[in-house]
């Protein structure tokens, strides 16, 4: 009986060891972004997005646009994304969304203050785009549908909706 007992425990120990090895290998199976070169970057970016549930693809795509928009340089973006999984990137996206200043149109003071916060939070490369956009905006007037339609938007969302905004501004159409 001692022999069977010893053999039984060896099998259990072997199964436990195999389970531990498999569990340790699982994180390695998670798709991660590799930014070491452009080909690997785009290949792994697609793999990471495909590894997410289909319901998260749109959020991931929009979030990546946000990351690129607010990044100071490609090197900074690559450093931030390298080695991250889809879930980790979605977490970064949520943190960014929560931290980005949004336009407040509730009063003239709130509007002007939120514009200053937006500008201060932009990478230097986007400040001229911001200043150009400001030139297209009419003066603040409570109830102005153009301004009201932008309430709660980040600057990136405003830029994405720029064609819509310009279609409501005759001065911008004449440029």
What function would you assign to each model-found segment?
Residues 1-27:
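Sec-dependent bacterial lipoprotein signal peptides
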Residues 17, 43-44, 113-114:
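Short hydrophobic "helix-edge" motifs at membrane interfaces and signal-peptide entry regions
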Residues 30-31:
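Bacterial signal peptide processing site
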Residues 35-59:
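Post-signal peptide N-terminal segment of mature Sec-exported envelope proteins
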Residues 63-175:
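Compact alpha-helical subdomains of small soluble proteins
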